[in-house]
Structure formats: C-alpha cells, structure tokens
Design a protein with these regions (language model features):
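Active-site cofactor/cluster-binding pocket
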Residues: 1-182
C-alpha cells in the first residue's frame, strides 16, 4: 500500500546494473489490514549469505512512516542513516503525538526527515511519495543515482511514460531535499 516493495524492487534493479550482490526479504505484518510491511535489503560487492540484517548493522533505515522508523531503529548501525517520512499513517488507536515521534527521530545524529506526501503533491506526483523517500535516501545508498533512475524506468515502464516521469520527478525531488540538508 505505501510502496515499500516498489522501493526495494527499484534498488534491486539498480544494483543489478552495477554487478552488485543483493538479497531481499519481506515481512508482511497483516499488511492487508493496515499492518507494517518490512523489507530487509542487503547490498554488497561480495556474496551475501543471509537476507536478514542483524541488529545494529543496517547502514540505512528508509521508512515511509515516522513511528515505524523508530520501531526499527535497533537495526541501525552507529553510523547509519535514518531516512523517514514525517507524515503519519494513523491506523491504530492512541497513536503517539507526532511532535514526540519527531523529537525521538531528531535525537539520531544522522537523520533526514521530510513530508514526502507533501513534496509528492507539490510536484504533481501525489502517488509517488515512496519514490520521494527513495530519492531522499539515495545519497546514502552506494549506487550511482543514474542507476536508480534506470531502475525506475524498468520497474514502472509497463505503466506508461507518465508514471515513469512522475516517479523520476519524485526521485529527483527527494534527492534534492537530502542534498539541501547534508
């Protein structure tokens, strides 16, 4: 629903172009009923044995929902980057105050927090907030940006040129946001 699988597929496509090894695992936590979808994505220039990321070993947590970003923080390495959307997906009673969640996110020294939904709407690509998030994470992914663009073209190509262009625009908008914050 929120595009985590499309993000992972795009990175996977981009990593193939760079002759990198990758393994991906998805966990669908009752996603049909509003639960979280989590995707572990490991990328390396060497062979990878396991598709799951050990606690404290992730270089990036890319989250399309702010509270979910905090849930997976134990996976992040000390030097890793937390890249998260600030627009909540309120699907539970007693959702915590957004200001408190943002305060917790800001405690992490390496973080990028953006309202990807608003950015996607502003650029006329309202359904591409997930790709705005991928663009925001792109400076921290060890793959050339052009390869992510090619991944977008391959993943969304069958949906037509308008969809591809909207997602490319979203990718660029997210990268531009992160570049302005570094």
């Amino acid at each position: 629903g929120q595009g985590i699988i499309s993000i992972a597929a795009t990175i996977g496509m981009a990593s193939l172009k760079n002759n990198l090894f990758f393994k991906q695992a998805e966990v669908h936590g009752m996603s049909q009923r509003g639960g979280a979808v989590q995707s572990h994505f490991r990328l390396s220039d060497k062979e990878i044995a396991s598709d799951l990321i050990p606690m404290g070993a992730a270089d990036i947590i890319l989250s399309v929902e702010p509270m979910e970003s905090l849930r997976y923080l134990p996976f992040l390495s000390e030097t890793g980057w937390l890249v998260t959307n600030t627009r909540p997906f309120v699907n539970i009673p007693n959702y915590p105050e957004l200001a408190e969640i943002i305060k917790e996110i800001e405690k992490h020294p390496n973080h990028i927090a953006l309202d990807a939904d608003q950015i996607a709407q502003e650029i006329g690509a309202a359904r591409s907030s997930n790709i705005v998030m991928l663009g925001a994470a792109s400076p921290f992914i060890q793959i050339p940006f052009e390869c992510l663009e090619d991944g977008i073209r391959k993943i969304f190509g069958a949906k037509g040129e308008d969809v591809v262009n909207a997602n490319l625009k979203a990718l660029h908008a997210g990268k531009q946001f992160s570049d302005s914050k570094k």
